[in-house]
């Protein structure tokens, strides 16, 4: 009955975000090579049901807000075997110039790739 440690869900949110970037054709490595980073400024996680070490889980991600400087994602972790919602969450991140640490506007070449995926809350 080993319950999944609560911190793992935040790591899974990150993995889902990285995969989302990749799926829309934006590589975080390319962003970094262009001098940008995407730090997360705020994280929320509401735990609804426990998950266990042998559970197969699915992380569902939605991009719910997008400006050229900020992105907000909502998450839902579910156990597909019984359709149990394990947790929900939210992250807010901002585009930052890695050289200065200052908030910066995302170049249009990246921004236009994300816009079609913004969903209303």
Question: What is each residue range found by the language model?
Answer:
Residues 5-6, 42, 49, 83:
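Histidine (H) residue identity feature
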Residues 7-8, 44, 72, 77:
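Compositionally biased, intrinsically disordered low-complexity segments enriched
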Residues 20-71:
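Hydrophobic beta-strand-centered segment that forms part of the acyl-chain substrate-binding groove
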Residues 1-40, 98-121:
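Hot-dog-fold acyl-thioester-processing enzymes
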Residues 52-53, 63-121:
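HotDog/MaoC-like acyl-thioester-processing domains
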């Amino acid at each position: 009955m080993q319950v999944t440690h609560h911190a793992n869900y935040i790591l899974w949110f990150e993995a889902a975000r990285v995969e989302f970037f990749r799926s829309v054709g934006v590589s975080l490595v390319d962003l970094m090579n262009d001098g940008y980073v995407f730090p997360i400024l705020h994280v929320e996680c509401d735990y609804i049901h426990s998950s266990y070490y042998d559970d197969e889980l699915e992380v569902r991600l939605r991009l719910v807000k997008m400006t050229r400087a900020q992105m907000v994602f909502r998450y839902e972790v579910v156990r597909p075997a019984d359709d149990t919602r394990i947790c929900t969450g939210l992250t807010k991140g901002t585009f930052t110039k890695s050289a200065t640490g200052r908030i910066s506007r995302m170049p249009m070449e990246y921004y236009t790739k994300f816009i079609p995926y913004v969903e209303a809350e």
